[in-house]
Amino acid sequence: MKISICGKGGCGKSSITTLLAKEFAKKGHNVLVIDGDESNLSLHKLLGMDLPKDFIEYLGGRKEFMKKLREKMDGKEVELFEGEISIDSLPKEYLVEKDNIKLLAIGKIHDFGEGCACPMGALLREFLKSLKLKDKEVVIVDTEAGIEHFGRGVEGGCDVIIAIIDPTYESIRLSKKIEEIGEKLGKKVYFIVNKVDDETKDLILENVNKDKVIAVIPNNKEIMKCGLMGEELNAELSEIKDVVEILTK
């Protein structure tokens, strides 16, 4: 199963990605977490890992990868990856692993003027389409904020889309767009309502498709502290356990 975690900036995508990854691993799954956000500097910290090397460098860097991709789109026989890709076949020097969870970072913006993130989005799209999973393997993609990754076709390689909704008008509006696009793609779309109290929970549930909501997560001091300090997140939430049960039915 390949899961895309999406939503507006600051809604809690990285925290939910971390909590889901750890719960899937506890249930005996082999988990690959993909950091698909070129601006994200906290996901690896929440997982308690070092930041891996940029995977796009394995393919020659941004310019070389885009050159190969353009040649492929022009009809030339170009292999972006050598043979079939599986989690076990990924180059270990581009992975960090802990407690049955592997972390892969597609690529980051490191310097002024180095160019846009389009090559990283294209690589993530092609990688997800090419990655073949075995039984009990799960991929969780922490996407960049917003919906540009939908325009790049990233979710075409995923089975499930989970939109994280926080107590903001923007987040509610975005969830409706994600639901619309995801259903046109024929993907399963779910919502996780995050960072709420009783009042904001009710307001959100009145304004989204409640049938898509698989968890409502209240404000949590441990999650907030880990996110603020860049510390490993080990919170155990019954809501996350329920999400994993739903996804593995």
Swiss-Prot record:
Pfam families, per database record: CbiA
MF terms (GO), sorted A to Z: ATP binding; ATP hydrolysis activity
Keywords attached to this entry: ATP-binding, Nucleotide-binding
GO cellular component, one term: cytosol
InterPro entries the record matches: CobQ/CobB/MinD/ParA_Nub-bd_dom, CooC, P-loop_NTPase, ParA/MinD_ATPase
Binding positions (ATP): 7-14
The keyword DNA-binding is assigned to this record: no
Name recorded for this polypeptide: Uncharacterized ATP-binding protein MJ0084
